Amino acid sequence: MSIRQQAVIPAEPAQVYGVLADADALSALSGMSGRPGRVEGEEFSAFNGNVTGRQVEMVPDARVVQAWRFPRWEAGVYSIVHFTLTAVDGGTRLVIEQHGEPQDWHDHIDANFPTFYLGTLVEHFSANAAG
């Protein structure tokens, strides 16, 4: 199974990357605890430990690839999440692609990317631009 979603975030790619690449920054936006993984190979957690994984690839201002799992998944089951950033008029196009999530989790994850990532980032950077 695969998921693909996108949005234009009203911020520069470096600003968006700064949130995606650091669970501390993501925690500040979501209000949920996390443990940062700031370099390739490092483990991270986000959303009060509901997502854990490892940073697979980190290309500043362009891409973050993570191996993800939820604690309720069978042991050893991970999916791969790609966050791709492209500068566009009005900010940064953020494309999120997730591959390999368990079929019974597809709808849950697909429904929550806007809540936990896309919508949150748009709201945060829109508020910063206005204020």
Q: Language-model features: where?
A:
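Residue-level detector of beta-strand structural context in well-folded domains
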Residues: 5-7, 34-35, 42, 53-54, ...
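Structured surface interface patches that mediate subunit assembly and partner/cofactor docking
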Residues: 25-28, 39, 115, 130-131
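A short gly/proline-enriched turn/hairpin at secondary-structure junctions
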Residues: 27-33, 40-41, 46-48, 69-70
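Hydrophobic-ligand binding "helix-grip"
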Residues: 45, 49-93, 99-101, 130
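A conserved amphipathic terminal alpha-helix motif
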Residues: 100-131
